[in-house]
Swiss-Prot record:
Annotated Pfam families: EF_TS
Organism for this UniProt entry: Symbiobacterium thermophilum (strain DSM 24528 / JCM 14929 / IAM 14863 / T)
Family: Belongs to the EF-Ts family.
InterPro entries to which the protein is assigned, alphabetical: EF-Ts_dimer_sf (IPR036402), Transl_elong_EFTs/EF1B (IPR001816), Transl_elong_EFTs/EF1B_dimer (IPR014039), Transl_elong_Ts_CS (IPR018101), UBA-like_sf (IPR009060)
Parts of the chain that traverse the membrane: none
Entries under HAMAP family matching the protein: EF_Ts
Protein name as catalogued: Elongation factor Ts
Keywords: Cytoplasm, Elongation factor, Protein biosynthesis
Main subcellular location of this protein, as a coarse class: cytoplasm
Stretches the record annotates as Involved in Mg(2+) ion dislocation from EF-Tu: 82-85
Phylogenetic placement of the source organism: Bacteria, Bacillati, Bacillota, Clostridia, Eubacteriales
GO cellular component terms given for this protein: cytoplasm
NCBIfam families documented for this protein: tsf (TIGR00116)
Cellular localisation: Cytoplasm
Length: 304
């Protein structure tokens, strides 16, 4: 068999658009025959799938699963190209499968997840006909007493995963605590909290905010020493905007979320702590390609 060189792999990738490892395998399977390797990739649907990977996948859905008595949960974002596909049964089933693989395999990274999934996503690309990407995921598992809760809003547009720790397993199982989890998830989804408490905000983020607030005060005509004093008050307002426990509760603006947690803890007779949360919004940060109308018409007519 001919030696498979890096140059051969690179040339096959350039011609087919397939992944590096797929190209290497194709060459190995065909004894280094370039044309046969191209055919092998096409037969496996890998060349077509790889070409689709060049298209922007900014639609999709955020999906969640919580199991094991609310002790183990997953939040995952899977992207595709169109809303039509995102609402289809095949894509929803794929999202659910990906989430269950995360629960079972406990991958530490996207690379590890892709390995655990095998050819599942590539097969879905070939079947559905769109670029599909598993973009990100988070997995929470309760170590002691506590519970995990997930909330999905608007057909998978926004998703939240939150973990609470509690004084005892009995407190975690209390209906009031389950209801609290849901209220907190709704709060995070709607008010876009970024951190649990002020202590969780990185020092560089606080310093950056201080610099901005000080510059704002000076631009308002305040002297530097006065501006410094103003920053102290304004940074507290910043915490109230980005920290979950400092936010006003959306259902009662006279009460902070932190006060709500303490109130429920008093009712159930045990300490409750918000350990962590994550909020995903479908497609956030993905730059969508802007097509003009003429290009769209040509594409739909099969001319482009």
């Amino acid at each position: 068999m001919a030696e498979i060189t890096a140059k051969m792999v690179a040339e096959l990738r350039a011609r087919t658009g397939a992944g590096m490892m797929d190209c290497k395998k194709a060459l190995m399977e065909t004894g280094g025959d370039f044309d046969k390797a191209v055919d092998w990739l096409r037969e496996k649907g890998l060349a077509a799938a790889a070409k689709k990977a060049g298209r922007v996948a900014a639609e999709g859905r955020v999906h969640a699963i919580v199991e094991d008595g609310a002790r183990h949960g997953v939040l995952v974002e899977v992207n595709c190209e169109t809303d039509f596909v995102a609402r289809g049964e095949a894509f929803i089933n794929l999202c659910d499968h990906v989430a269950r693989v995360i629960l079972q395999a406990r991958p530490a990274s996207l690379e590890a997840l892709q390995e655990a999934l095998g050819d599942t996503v590539k097969e879905a690309v070939a079947k559905i006909g769109e670029n599909i990407q598993v973009r990100r995921f988070e997995r929470y598992e309760v170590a002691d007493a506590g519970r995990v809760h997930a909330y999905i809003h608007g057909d998978g547009r926004v998703g939240v995963l939150i973990e609470l720790t509690t004084a005892t397993p009995e407190v975690a199982a209390h209906p009031e605590v389950e209801a609290l989890c849901h209220e907190l998830a709704l709060q995070i989804a709607s008010m876009r909290a970024q951190y649990v408490r002020p202590e969780d905000v990185p020092a560089q983020v606080i310093e950056h905010e201080r610099e901005i607030l000080k510059a704002q005060a000076i631009n308002e005509g305040k002297k530097p020493e006065i501006a410094e004093k103003m920053v102290a008050g304004r940074i507290q307002k910043f915490f109230q905007e980005v920290c979950l426990l400092e936010q006003e509760w959306v259902k009662d603006s006279k009460k902070t979320v932190g006060a709500l947690v303490k109130e429920v803890a008093g009712k159930v007779g045990g300490e409750i702590t918000v350990k962590r949360f994550v909020r995903y919004e479908k497609g956030e940060g993905i730059e969508k390609r802007q097509d003009d109308f003429a290009e769209e018409v040509m594409r739909q007519a099969g001319l482009k």
